[in-house]
Amino acid sequence: MSRCLSVVALSLLAVLPTLALAYQAEPPRAPLQVLRVDRYTDDANAGSLRWAITTANAAPGRYRIEIDAVGVAPYVIRPASPLPEIKGPVQIIGTSWARDGQYIAIDGSAYVTGTGTDACPGAEPGQSGTNVRTTTLPGLVLRDTQGVELVGLEIRNFCIGVLVNRSSHNEIHDNRIVANKGGAGIMLTGDDGKGQSTATTTMHNRIVRNEFLDNGDGLELTRGAAWNLVADNLFQSTPANPEPSQGIEILWGNDNSVVRNRFVDYSDGLQINWGNRNYIAANTFTGNSIGLSITGSGNVVDGNTITGNGIGIGVRPQPVSAPNRFTANRIYGNGLLIERCEAGGACMKGQPRGAIVFGVPGLEHASFVGSRGRGVDNDPSKRAHICTAAGQADCQPLPNLGQAAPQLTAVQGKGAQRQLNGRFKGVPDSHYQVEVFGNRATNGREAEWVLGSVEARTDAQGQGSFTFPLGTGADAAAAGSLTATVTSAQGATSPLSAPLSLR
């Protein structure tokens, strides 16, 4: 037996070197050659940014472009005409940022001229500005490439700050993106050049730790952009912004992750237009007309703080009602009269406001009030109508599969035995999740903090009931009122229930 084991052991030892070779780490890469930008004059001579990009494009993967701080701050390069498109792999680094936090600015004002958003024409004649199809006058262009890294730059005063078109595996981090007044601060799009989506061309890009200030749209994920990460950024608009549209717009973009960002003072903090399975988590939305405006299917809004907006989450109708999930969000202090409606927002007379509102009109609806984009046909007869009840014809149905809010009926018991009872309606013989929230005020109608969740089922008639243990925990004890949502097995979350006062 010992001899047999020794033979086996020797055989394993013989093949281990081969296995190790098969799984060894990637060999070290050759060091990159540095192209140093130490002149801010826009010409083709050595030392200029234009020269550096042109040189790097001739041998992708060989170079790192380092832009030095020349003279005294602020450090500004003003191209006189569009720069060459960037071919990766390549790094473009503003060197002063890592040293003292100063950005090197690339400023488009020398050739992007005109009044306001009229300086940025769209792809269709007569249209201009944000929220019309455009790839006009971008600052830095990543098209049909990969492996580009941008860091330590301030990119400002273009129509699009950075255009990422049919490009993947790029990283844009630790930059300032300022006052790009047409398409977006950063636009990630699979646009095929004719307005159609391409499904696998704009993937696995990372947009992290940037500051987006006073862009029309801060960032766009459109026309097939998928599996991209947008994390730890600030998206902010101020009164200086002529067209404060969206912090982020997702249009026909799927499976993107948007996490730990801040969205401040836009028409919509984030707007999803027929995008699917996007994951929106741990963000903060404040001061927006609508915090999140949503269509599409399978999107998850999870663990966000949504406070001080007109509407917290606005769920828009679409031709076929589809499920979207809202879970573990803190939603409070909304319902403000913020009428900022540049291709989004809530300005319709009598518009309901609050934490979660179904049936909010968007640009696609006849009842929308606001700008659909400069030069866009506003004829309401060409727009969709919203159904006000189930079973109506010639209108778009209630969103989120029409899932109705639960009803909270009573709190029973004392101390550790205290429990919340409620009921809801849904699909017969189906599984549901009920999520319960606490509010400080006795008439609090939002979701100030999460108390927990409980599973429930419907019977053959679609009637469901639930019991949620409140116990003696501090969160439950501090609540002056309770609210709840119910989410179906398909992932369709209801609006919040009417509050149940505890005092």
Task: Please tell me what each predicted stretch does.
Residues 1-9:
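Bacterial N-terminal signal peptides that target proteins for export
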Residues 8-17:
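Bacterial N-terminal signal peptides
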Residues 23-161, 166-171, 324-477, 483-488, ...:
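N-terminal, post-signal-peptide segments of secreted/periplasmic proteins
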Residues 33, 63, 75, 88-90, ...:
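The right-handed parallel beta-helix/beta-solenoid scaffold, focusing on the short coil/turn
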Residues 107-249:
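Right-handed parallel beta-helix
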Residues 110, 159-164, 181-188, 214-223, ...:
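Short glycine/acidic-rich loop motifs that flank beta-strands on beta-rich extracellular proteins
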Residues 491-503:
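Edge beta-strands of extracellular beta-sandwich domains
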